[in-house]
Amino acid sequence: QKDLEQIRQKLYHDSYSLMCSTFLKSYSLQVDRHCIGSYISPQDIQILDVCDSWNEAIRIASSPLLKKGDIEQRYIEEMINAVRNYGTYMVLTPEIAYVHAGVNDGIHRNCSALLLLKKPVIFGNFNKKKICAVVVLGINNRKEDSDLLNLAYILGKEENLKRLKEKDITIKDILELHD
């Protein structure tokens, strides 16, 4: 039974990774360029030194969206349950988890938030991965979801990953990261 579950997890992770990789490659061919500030507002970005656990990181990252009414508490719980049930497939780029739940799980509008951690946290309960950032993707309208997924392309760029790890990075610096 455990072997079957591991195979299921591996297939799910591999197919999701392939889908994201295909998206990122197609996005790199586009002419229009964007910055993080095009997708996340300054009040939805947080920088912390440390976080005790991956589920706490998701809760903290989501808190600005919850306060504004963009998402409900159950959306946060469903994101945490998705990691518990499906593993770390949401870590699309090195050390960054792009967490989300379903369109019927308490999302009111497309939104996004980012939590940057100075000290990485271990993400997931199995297939654990080290992360330094959590990006919350609140996708209510599937037709517009590719706009939010552009964040993965921007944050996945090597120079942007290096910048995120600099000790003196500010919210303004994060907003200016671009593709």
Summary of predicted features, one role per range:
Residues 1-179:
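Cytosolic covalent-transfer regions centered on His/Cys nucleophiles
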